């Protein structure tokens, strides 16, 4: 969704005979990637599978809002009166097979068959190719002001061969939450969240250097 702010009182003598439009993105776009750190990737007999992702928020992600087409500003639902107009928390990301974006597949490795995204030490997209999440921005171009206003809750399995010659992997399941930081989900910006899965923690790297109305910026947060 792109909107051009109003151009008023244009005249041929001052506009060179042309009407110009300044189009800008008014939503915020999100994609997600994941990889393993060296504590896991160094073991060829261990695999990591992401089985689910949800977003938790403190009534920040609106499900509906009103945009002023004149100046491209948003009016968010009033709290607490219109709390029902915000997305549920947690907001579960659905699989592509369920009209969502999460690229869940069937690994079929050493008896492990849970629908999941297999990851390794090379960052790979968790979404189906050319699929993104689009959100109504939080507080216009400001984005989040508190690091815990939006969190990612990641559920993943670590499957490993318990002994030499074993044909069935032993599986341990985990769910960890990580704050996505401040200044995110801002109007006109596109974000790539890269999660690094370790044995004891998840680290998230946030990049917004895309061809939207943005400048490059990286942030690192670690959750233990």
What are these regions (language model features)?
Residues 1-224:
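Extracytoplasmic cysteine-anchoring/structural motifs
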């Amino acid at each position: 969704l792109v909107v051009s702010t109003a151009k008023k009182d244009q005249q041929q003598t001052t506009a060179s005979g042309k009407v110009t439009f300044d189009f800008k993105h008014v939503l915020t776009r999100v994609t997600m990637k994941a990889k393993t750190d060296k504590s896991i990737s160094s073991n060829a007999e261990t695999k990591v599978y992401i089985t689910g992702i949800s977003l938790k928020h403190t009534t920040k992600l609106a499900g509906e809002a009103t945009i002023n087409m004149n100046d491209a500003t948003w009016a968010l639902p009033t709290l607490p009166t219109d709390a029902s107009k915000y997305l549920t928390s947690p907001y579960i990301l659905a699989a592509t097979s369920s009209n969502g974006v999460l690229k869940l597949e069937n690994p079929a490795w050493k008896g492990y068959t849970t629908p999941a995204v297999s990851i390794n030490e090379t960052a790979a997209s968790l979404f189906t190719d050319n699929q993104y999440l689009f959100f109504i921005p939080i507080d216009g171009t400001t984005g989040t002001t508190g690091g815990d206003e939006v969190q990612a809750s990641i559920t993943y399995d670590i499957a490993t061969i318990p002994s030499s010659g074993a044909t069935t992997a032993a599986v341990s399941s985990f769910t960890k939450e990580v704050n996505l930081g401040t200044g995110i989900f801002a109007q006109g910006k596109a974000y790539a969240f890269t999660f690094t899965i370790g044995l004891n923690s998840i680290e998230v790297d946030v990049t917004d250097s895309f061809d939207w109305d943005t400048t490059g910026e990286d942030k690192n947060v670690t959750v233990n």
